[in-house]
Amino acid sequence: GANGARDAQIVQAALDRLCLLEFADRQLGTLSGGERQRVMVARALAQEPRLLILDEPTNHLDIRHQLEVLALIRDLPLTIVASLHDLNMASAACDDVLLLQAGRSLGFGQPDAIFTEKMVSSAFRVQTCRERLAPSNTEHLTFKL
């Protein structure tokens, strides 16, 4: 019926948005880890949520697909809560971040205010340095034990 056709359109749009149309007829078990990750994000988008909670949405993805997924979810007209362990990626992709240590909040706010050398060093017990990269003129965190 009409609902089935609408559902098919929604699924098709989610697959298209994540460049997964070529995988539509494949079994999940035949896909690579990165392909499966993208399928799971598309599956969540097909539900048309207002709030999307993603646990490591870039895990198992090559850098191009990481950037594509983050750009895609950033452009969605909904609230996204995502766990990302790559602090530089989180800084570039997120409006606000929550820095946790052992399940406790160390800070919440804009990435530049939260991902300071002092706070990141404290959270992860590493030496942290914020450096400006040339020629992009972007800031980047580096770490040492």
Residue ranges and their predicted role:
Residues 90-92:
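A short, surface-exposed alpha-helical micro-motif characterized by mixed small hydrophobic
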Residues 52-56:
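Catalytic Walker B motif of ABC-type/P-loop ATPase nucleotide-binding domains
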Residues 3, 27-31, 35:
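Conserved ABC ATPase signature
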